[in-house]
Amino acid sequence: MIKGIAITTVWVLDQDRAKDFYTEKLGLEVRTDMTMGGEQGMRWLTVGAESQPDVELTLMVPGPPGLDPESAEAMKKLVSKGVLGAGVLSTDDIHRDYETLKAKGVDFLQEPRERPYGTEAILRDDSGNWFSLTQRNEQLDLDKAWGECVDPM
């Protein structure tokens, strides 16, 4: 039986730049950084939050062995265009983290806004992927207006 989510892929344009962004700006830690299949093989690079040792993001450049050249090129265009939302990053103090990340040069598409589920800001990584940075409420408040939603494009 499935026990949880362990690894998910975030498509990036440059693994070294992505590694710097996710570790130096977002504060995640490198879990794995190795080449599989010899010197010309595929680089397997994962990062994760110290508080979640069982959950990792694989920072992958679109290409073989998983994608043929045409699909890889299409994926790179989608990533750089900012079409792909990569997920939700959780925080216990969104205003503190928003200011800290902004000071580190993280690109925010939306400043913190109240939502029925909590407060969220939308950020973009150095490849174009966007994430919701969210501080969740104890309970869902369906009476609260959603407010204006940002278009990541």
Task: Give, region by region, the residue ranges found by the protein language model.
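Residue-level detector of high-confidence beta-strand sites
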Residues: 31-33, 111, 133
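Short glycine-/small-residue motifs
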Residues: 56-57, 130-133
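Core segments of cupin and vicinal oxygen chelate
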Residues: 11-62
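Active-site/binding-pocket entry motifs
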Residues: 53, 63-67, 139
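Vicinal oxygen chelate
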Residues: 13-16, 64-130
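Active-site beta-strand termini and strand-to-loop segments that position acidic
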Residues: 48-52, 123-126, 136
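A short acidic/small-residue loop/turn micro-motif
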Residues: 38, 116, 136-140
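N-terminal beta-strand motif that seeds the catalytic metal site of vicinal oxygen chelate
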Residues: 1-19, 32, 84-89, 137-153
